[in-house]
Regions:
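Bacterial Sec-dependent N-terminal signal peptides
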Residues: 13-44
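Histidine-/acidic-rich catalytic cores in large beta-rich domains
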Residues: 38-55, 60-66, 70, 92, ...
Length: 517
């Protein structure tokens, strides 16, 4: 029979494709004593970029199907098992999820076409230690789930050299099960991905690289699957995939004296820019309602740090760290502005921006008319604005959740605290109601002046709250906190301590990586 590439896209730990550039490690044609297996060969880190991945070449004497278990060292919950339908005699199996500095055990079970077990076989794979750039991970609140869960960390820590940035995935036991090291990569050796990687629907990863001014799709072995040039413009901060496959990207427009204030849509198939949102036109680039010591506002007046796409009305939501959150239609016209009401005047195209400001409602759905609350000088018992925010996300109910960093809160650095906050927005009536929040009760412990993210985990009705630049006891640390949406009880909490950081940033964000269907 011909070669069968066994696709493991439904589990993070196994994917399509093989590579011949590798280091052999583990059992290589051992004394098999088998009536089924002709040969087994294990190649560790076949691309050179994913040290905890391996490739298994398996040849059999008759047609079989295969089940593989990566045996976890924290009991059965930490196992990764996958069964493969269909039969063949020649396989290339890619394995993801090995432990570093460990003699890993892989259990292979071979079945005939009727599902009868023909043979069980153990294969061992010895791995090197983690590189020195990886952090210490402590589990502060262990999860009680019986499912193996994975957290993708868009990491800013390092030992000696910040670049290339090195994303990693750790499980709920605090073990790093995957990471990328592009130090020897011909194109990504100076990787700066800012917001970092997101997982595409096909299981691959999407990110931008400021060093090459390009967007990339890679697989879990670090192989470039596709790329898109930004045509001389700079990348900063975020790229997301639309439902139709096209890409939305925040860029530095090379033709402008300002930065981080333009969004483009890239046709995924052709690489063409098919739409541009220039915030200099839709907003007021002279507004200085939110001052900062982290940027020159004459150049970096908006600081676009995150995007969200609203499929319901084909509009985009853009977070500007020093302005607020704005929703724009395809013609670059403002639908609403989520920000305190201070100093909103006329846009670059001459439009009065005050008409797009949202009026907060109290718990009884009555408008809050206190001018100090509208201005942001004080908070209302039922409502607070978000400040210098990141990570706007649309929830299944249509509400907007934001990571409210809380920098310069109430213009006096009140707090300090950061929040995950959910707002219900009525675009027609231009009202906003705060319906849920978490983080204020944690105070300075989870305060992150910059970066950070929130995610809503619909399968568990929980929120992942990840302050990435918090400081604990004077030592930079990031927190990964999962809270129950209904009770706000902490379901899981981990602390990430890198050896070194830039601007006290441990990570830009953390994503709960899903198993694919």
């Amino acid at each position: 029979m011909g070669l069968r590439n066994v696709g493991l896209l439904t589990l993070l730990f196994f994917l399509f494709y093989a590579c011949s550039d590798d280091d052999t490690s583990g059992d290589t044609n051992p004394d098999l004593d088998s009536d089924v297996i002709r040969s087994i060969n294990v190649r560790l880190n076949p691309t050179g970029y994913a040290p905890l991945n391996a490739l298994i070449d398996l040849e059999t004497l008759e047609a079989v199907s295969v089940e593989i278990t990566v045996v976890g060292r924290e009991g059965s919950t930490s196992n990764i098992t996958r069964s493969f339908p269909g039969t063949a005699t020649s396989f290339e199996l890619e394995v993801f999820g090995l432990y570093a500095n460990y003699n890993n055990t892989l259990e292979l079970t071979l079945f005939d076409g009727s599902g009868v077990v023909l043979e069980n076989r153990e294969v061992t794979v010895e791995t090197p230690p983690l590189i020195a750039d990886m952090p210490q991970i402590s589990i502060d609140v262990p999860t009680n789930t019986s499912e193996l869960e994975f957290n993708l960390v868009n990491y800013f820590g390092f030992s000696q050299n910040f670049r290339p940035q090195r994303p990693f995935i750790f499980d709920q036991f605090g073990d790093i099960r995957w990471y990328l090291n592009f130090t020897s990569h011909p194109e990504l050796s100076d990787l700066f991905f800012d917001n970092g990687m997101t997982q595409l629907r096909n299981g691959n990863f999407l990110f931008g690289n400021a060093a090459t001014r390009s967007i990339y799709e890679i697989d879990l072995f670090g192989r470039i699957v596709d790329s898109w040039s930004l045509q001389g413009n700079g990348f900063h901060h975020h790229v997301i995939e639309k439902p139709d496959g096209n890409l939305l990207v925040t860029i530095n427009d090379a033709s402008k004296s300002t930065v981080e204030d333009v969004v483009i849509e890239i046709d995924r198939a052709t690489g063409e820019f098919i739409n541009t949102w220039d915030l200099n036109n839709s907003l007021d680039n002279s507004r200085r309602g939110w001052p900062t010591d982290l940027a020159d506002l004459n150049e970096d007046w908006f600081h676009a740090n995150a995007l969200e796409y609203s499929a319901e009305d084909d509009e985009i939501i853009v977070s500007g760290r020093t302005q607020g959150v704005v929703k724009l239609n395809q013609q670059n016209e403002v639908s609403y502005i989520l920000a305190p009401h201070r100093d909103w005047n006329t846009s670059g195209d001459g439009t009065d921006l005050a008409q797009f400001l949202l009026t907060p409602l109290d718990a009884n759905d009555q408008p809050i008319t206190d001018l100090d609350v509208l201005d942001g000088t004080v908070n209302h018992p039922d409502f607070e604005w978000s400040w210098y925010q990141h990570s706007p996300i649309l929830m299944p109910n249509g509400n907007l959740m934001i990571f409210d960093n809380g920098d310069n809160r109430n213009y006096i650095n009140a707090g300090p605290y950061s929040r995950a906050v959910e707002y219900e927005i009525d675009e027609q009536n231009k009202t906003i109601k705060q319906v849920w929040s978490y983080g204020k009760e944690r105070g300075s412990e989870t305060y992150a002046r910059i970066v950070s993210k929130v995610s809503y985990l619909s399968d568990k009705n929980s929120v992942l709250f990840t302050p990435g630049s918090s400081v604990s006891g004077g030592v930079p640390a990031g927190k990964v906190i999962e809270v129950d949406y209904g009770t706000k009880s902490v379901l899981f909490e981990a602390t990430i301590n890198p050896p070194n950081t830039i601007f006290n940033i441990s990570f830009h964000n953390v994503l709960r990586v899903s198993l694919l269907d």
